Amino acid sequence: MDTFESVKAVVVEQLSVDANEVKPESRFIEDLNADSLDVVELVMALEEKFSIEIPDEEAEKIKTVKDVVAYIEANK
C-alpha cells in the first residue's frame, strides 16, 4: 500500500468520511468537515501509524491530504 492509500485509510477512519471524498487535494477543514480537534486527533493517529513525530509547527502547515503524504515521505 502506498503512502497516499495508507493516509487515506487513517483519514477515513478518524474523520468518518467516505473514502471517495478523500483525494490528494482534499482540505481537512473545508472539504472533509474536520474541526481543530479532529485535526489534532488525525495528526496523532498518523504519528502512530507511521511511527513519526509531527511537531506542532509542522502540523499547523498541514492543510490537505497531499501535505500529509509529502511530510511523511520526507520524514520516514
Curated annotation (Swiss-Prot):
Q: What residue intervals traverse the membrane? A: none
GO terms for cellular component: cytosol; membrane
Keyword check for Lyase? no
| InterPro entries, sorted | ACP (IPR003231), ACP-like_sf (IPR036736), EAL_dom (IPR001633), PP-bd_ACP (IPR009081), Ppantetheine_attach_site (IPR006162)
Where does it localize? Cytoplasm
Which GO MF terms does the UniProt record name?
acyl binding; acyl carrier activity
Concerning NCBIfam families, the annotation shows: acyl_carrier, PRK00982.1-2, PRK00982.1-4, PRK00982.1-5
General function of this protein: Carrier of the growing fatty acid chain in fatty acid biosynthesis.
Name listed for the protein in its UniProt record: Acyl carrier protein
